[in-house]
Amino acid sequence: MARLLRALRGLPWLEAPGRARGCAGSGRGDTGSLIKSKLSLSKADWQKKLTPEQFYVTREKGTEAPFSGMYLKNKETGMYHCVCCDSPLFSSEKKYCSGTGWPSFSEAHGTKGSDESHTGILRRLDTSLGCPRMEVVCKQCEAHLGHVFPDGPDPTGQRFCINSVALKFKPSKP
């Protein structure tokens, strides 16, 4: 618990909602773009756009069953995007097998050192289960993606534990 709290203290906190946000890519196969405004749909519109499972996870902060996600064992090279708004979120280059049952990444796409200001994600404190965790949401549409924990591999020490159903994979072009 102390390790988690120390890790939380050193993290960048939320940007104000509604501000223009950068979601720039980095180099090879750049899939980033400047996001000019936050995507906001009604509950009914999200339900029309998404499958019931996608809606439950991304809009109601649900969690898919462990070891059930379609991207858990995906080893293709490419980019993982938000299933709701198509923002680039995680590169396959930062994906690893954590053994937890969900796709895991060591950092978000666009991270520069410890600076996540050019990524497609935001972190939010989640105390819903009675112990503090760091929720990961999409900057563009605020979709719940999963959580990040301070028990990942070097050099970041982070484990972004992300629901497959919240992602859309786009393979790199040859």
Curated annotation (Swiss-Prot):
It comes from the Eukaryota. Residues 1-61 form a transit peptide. It is found in: Mitochondrion. GO terms for molecular function: actin binding; L-methionine-(R)-S-oxide reductase activity; peptide-methionine (R)-S-oxide reductase activity; zinc ion binding. Its cofactor is Zn(2+). The keyword rRNA-binding does not apply. Binds 1 zinc ion per subunit. Its EC number is 1.8.4.12, 1.8.4.14. Gene3D superfamilies: Peptide methionine sulfoxide reductase. Residues 62-172 form the MsrB domain. GO terms for cellular component: cytoplasm; mitochondrion. Transmembrane segments: none annotated. GO terms for biological process: actin filament polymerization; protein repair; response to oxidative stress. InterPro entries: Met_Sox_Rdtase_MsrB, Met_Sox_Rdtase_MsrB_dom, Mss4-like_sf. SUPFAM superfamilies: Mss4-like (SSF51316). It catalyses: L-methionyl-[protein] + [thioredoxin]-disulfide + H2O = L-methionyl-(R)-S-oxide-[protein] + [thioredoxin]-dithiol; [thioredoxin]-disulfide + L-methionine + H2O = L-methionine (R)-S-oxide + [thioredoxin]-dithiol. Keywords: Metal-binding, Mitochondrion, Oxidoreductase, Transit peptide, Zinc. Methionine-sulfoxide reductase that specifically reduces methionine (R)-sulfoxide back to methionine. While in many cases, methionine oxidation is the result of random oxidation following oxidative stress, methionine oxidation is also a post-translational modification that takes place on specific residue. Upon oxidative stress, may play a role in the preservation of mitochondrial integrity by decreasing the intracellular reactive oxygen species build-up through its scavenging role, hence contributing to cell survival and protein maintenance. Belongs to the MsrB Met sulfoxide reductase family. This is Methionine-R-sulfoxide reductase B2, mitochondrial. It comes from Rattus norvegicus.
